[in-house]
Curated annotation (Swiss-Prot):
CDD domains assigned: RadA_SMS_N
Protein name: DNA repair protein RadA
Record-linked NCBIfam families: sms
Organism encoding this protein: Escherichia coli (strain K12)
Chain ranges for the short sequence motif RadA KNRFG motif as given in the UniProt record: 258-262
Amino acid sequence: MAKAPKRAFVCNECGADYPRWQGQCSACHAWNTITEVRLAASPMVARNERLSGYAGSAGVAKVQKLSDISLEELPRFSTGFKEFDRVLGGGVVPGSAILIGGNPGAGKSTLLLQTLCKLAQQMKTLYVTGEESLQQVAMRAHRLGLPTDNLNMLSETSIEQICLIAEEEQPKLMVIDSIQVMHMADVQSSPGSVAQVRETAAYLTRFAKTRGVAIVMVGHVTKDGSLAGPKVLEHCIDCSVLLDGDADSRFRTLRSHKNRFGAVNELGVFAMTEQGLREVSNPSAIFLSRGDEVTSGSSVMVVWEGTRPLLVEIQALVDHSMMANPRRVAVGLEQNRLAILLAVLHRHGGLQMADQDVFVNVVGGVKVTETSADLALLLAMVSSLRDRPLPQDLVVFGEVGLAGEIRPVPSGQERISEAAKHGFRRAIVPAANVPKKAPEGMQIFGVKKLSDALSVFDDL
């Protein structure tokens, strides 16, 4: 009598598996997301001489000394976009597996189609589409005015068939659009399920490593903006980037969340035009597009994104509340950080906003997570509360501690130099970040406590 196939219960949100069904996932706490899947042996586990030479593949394992391993770096090649290259750490590494995600309509397919059309003039590329027909892709390329003479296209959703064709074509870069519609014959579940996404991603990663083909996989995102599919998907790939942008804005930000070949949290900025995505070489000029009129509640700070400084504007609106519980709204900043800074301002600055509504926003849709924005945010709120504008040529950065001390931030010299390059002539920074030699024509105020920063603000 044949054995019944093994089954497991897997959460569709996070990929956690359980021996039996339950209503709520213990890992991500989502309800009614656990489904039954049939387990099947992956064909990649079986012995296959074609896949030897990559960790986890078949073949005879050989122990080597670390000193005997060649240190020759794989030569990168450019995508044709300097901002895209920056996010990837300097270009595409042959044999790497890259995952790019983003909301529907963000421009993932457009960016990759533009990239492949540029690279097709120099090397062999392959664009595999499973969501659109070849005619639809051709219409989009024609609308964008892209050179399509040398770009190879394939409409297929079977991973085994795609890899067979890719082995014949031998492209240097291949795009899979998207990983959620691909499937493997030996996995008994529908495309887009946790098991299918996990196995197809592992199959493509192994193919990339053993053939030296760089593969870019397009991934969907969930309602909260994170990459859809099991968490193991992000573990098996080399680089994970997210293309983000507001629906009412033409600017798009490309940020790396994982990168084995470069810096994490590197940021690239693009603008959506009629000819597709165009890179923005000077993002600070966009995020600082302020008018000539000076307004209260606005401050400029320097954030560190990956390997470069970026000037952004923080706006704050403090107004008397008509409700028993005043509102605290933060866009582009952490809500908990705002609550902490309001408490510090009350305790160590002598300013209480218990009866005030507080709204803060980072202009341009940039999300600031580092604590160097603390001092700029506090001064913006004080400026709005007192209805007194900060000078246009003033830049502020610094971390604020719970005791009211102003802590230094990394790369202080580079932040000050970036501000001076854009015409700022005054700066309020932590005392430990004051350079020995300030940029010519720039006045720097070093502060150690919150009270010192408020005193400087009063004297400006």
